[in-house]
């Protein structure tokens, strides 16, 4: 049985969650926390399998609640939204960066009745996320700026584009990478991040405010610029048109994913061939693997996040198992490798896979 702790001050959300769970013998709502502080305390005392935290536009800081849970009693956390996602984008981005696994919509009601497909999706997501192994986080110490490193001389032909695919745990991993890449990166970065609709604008805004690179949601036909990060919009496929422009389309899902990492990797492979670099980050499932086949056949390079630093090792494991990855790296080493490869230098050392 999955034991759920709900953190909400909203009677409406409490009622929706209770009604969704009451008909499922494999799920139990153990208690309701009325504040972030209560949620942290109850998590340590009750040891639930998962904590569902309401995304609040006011009051307690949702991100701080997640952060404190990860420090005091590491437990899978999902954020629940029952409002317009566009109003909560920045808040959700901070919560995901703090360690929340996903933002999911609360079960939807039609009149007095809950919609059965919404109940099933809600419960299946809660159960899947409750199985994720999370690790304790530590309070960050203030550190001085790192001294700039001398760049090794150019040793190889540089790449022209970077594609990144991520799912569960991705927002925090993406931020960890982008904060360590300087604004003068000579190539653009395109990112597919699986998440609920309505939150990608907030993620882009949050990243743009906290990392050296320019971060935005991709627009069809936009010119590719170096040092710029483009995030796939909701329910759209992201790729390139030739070597100079973005292509944002309503093309069909690839293996159920839209946006899809495989779609992105295949698109950049066709345009940039051996001058493309793909990075597969933490996430459930196997998105990205199919696209890596095309990218590797075109001569491109691929990096996968290692198991220890992944929240969920599904996507990287699939890519590694298929023999499509050049380097398997801990999260903290990926930015350095992207920068080195983009500048045409020999890659910093990592675990090599061929």
Swiss-Prot record:
The keyword Metal-binding does not apply. Residues 158-340 form the CheB-type methylesterase domain. GO terms for molecular function: phosphorelay response regulator activity; protein-glutamate methylesterase activity; protein-glutamine glutaminase activity. Residues 3-121 form the Response regulatory domain. Transmembrane segments: none annotated. The active site is at 167, 194, 287. CDD domains: CheB_Rec (cd16432), REC_CheB-like (cd17541). It catalyses: [protein]-L-glutamate 5-O-methyl ester + H2O = L-glutamyl-[protein] + methanol + H(+); L-glutaminyl-[protein] + H2O = L-glutamyl-[protein] + NH4(+). InterPro entries: CheB-like, CheB_C, CheY-like_superfamily, Sig_transdc_resp-reg_Me-estase, Sig_transdc_resp-reg_receiver. GO terms for cellular component: cytoplasm. Keywords: Chemotaxis, Cytoplasm, Hydrolase, Plasmid. It holds the Pfam family CheB_methylest. One of its GO terms (biological process) is chemotaxis. Its main location: cytoplasm. Its EC number is 3.1.1.61, 3.5.1.44. It is found in: Cytoplasm. Contains a C-terminal catalytic domain, and an N-terminal region which modulates catalytic activity. PANTHER family: PROTEIN-GLUTAMATE METHYLESTERASE/PROTEIN-GLUTAMINE GLUTAMINASE (PTHR42872), PROTEIN-GLUTAMATE METHYLESTERASE_PROTEIN-GLUTAMINE GLUTAMINASE (PTHR42872:SF6). Involved in chemotaxis. Part of a chemotaxis signal transduction system that modulates chemotaxis in response to various stimuli. Catalyzes the demethylation of specific methylglutamate residues introduced into the chemoreceptors (methyl-accepting chemotaxis proteins or MCP) by CheR. Also mediates the irreversible deamidation of specific glutamine residues to glutamic acid. R.meliloti does not have a group 2 operon. Belongs to the CheB family. This is Protein-glutamate methylesterase/protein-glutamine glutaminase of group 3 operon. The lineage of its organism: Bacteria, Pseudomonadati, Pseudomonadota, Alphaproteobacteria, Hyphomicrobiales.
């Amino acid at each position: 049985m999955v034991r759920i702790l709900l953190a909400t001050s909203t009677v409406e959300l409490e009622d929706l969650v209770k009604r969704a769970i009451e008909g499922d013998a494999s799920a139990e709502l153990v208690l309701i926390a009325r504040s972030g502080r209560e949620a942290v305390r109850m998590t340590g005392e009750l040891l639930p399998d998962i904590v569902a935290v309401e995304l609040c536009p006011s009051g307690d800081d949702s991100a701080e609640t997640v952060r404190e849970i990860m420090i005091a009693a590491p437990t899978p956390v999902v954020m629940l939204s029952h409002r317009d996602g566009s109003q909560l984008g920045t808040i959700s981005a901070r919560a995901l960066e703090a360690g929340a696994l996903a933002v999911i919509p609360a079960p939807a009601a039609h009149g007095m009745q809950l919609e059965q497909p919404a109940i099933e999706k809600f419960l299946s997501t809660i159960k899947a996320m409750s199985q994720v192994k999370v690790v304790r986080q530590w309070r960050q110490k203030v550190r001085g700026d790192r001294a700039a490193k001398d760049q090794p001389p150019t040793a190889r032909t540089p790449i022209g584009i970077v594609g990144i695919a991520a799912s569960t745990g991705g927002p925090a991993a993406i931020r960890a990478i982008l904060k360590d890449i300087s604004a003068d990166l000579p190539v653009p970065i395109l990112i597919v991040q699986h998440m609920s609709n309505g939150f990608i604008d907030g993620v882009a805004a949050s990243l743009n405010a906290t990392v050296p690179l320019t971060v935005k949601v991709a627009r069809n036909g936009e010119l590719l610029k170096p040092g710029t990060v483009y995030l796939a919009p909701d329910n759209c496929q992201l790729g390139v048109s030739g070597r100079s422009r973005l292509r944002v389309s309503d093309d069909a899902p690839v293996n159920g994913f839209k946006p899809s990492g495989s779609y992105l990797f295949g698109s950049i492979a066709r345009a940039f061939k051996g001058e493309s670099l793909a990075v597969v980050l933490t996430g459930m499932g196997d998105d990205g693997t199919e696209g890596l086949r095309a990218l590797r056949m075109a001569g491109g390079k691929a990096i996968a996040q290692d198991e220890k630093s992944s929240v969920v090792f599904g996507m990287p494991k699939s890519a590694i198992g298929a023999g499509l990855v050049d380097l398997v790296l801990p999260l903290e080493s990926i930015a350095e490798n992207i920068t080195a490869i983009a500048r045409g230098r020999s890659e910093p050392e990592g675990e090599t896979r061929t």
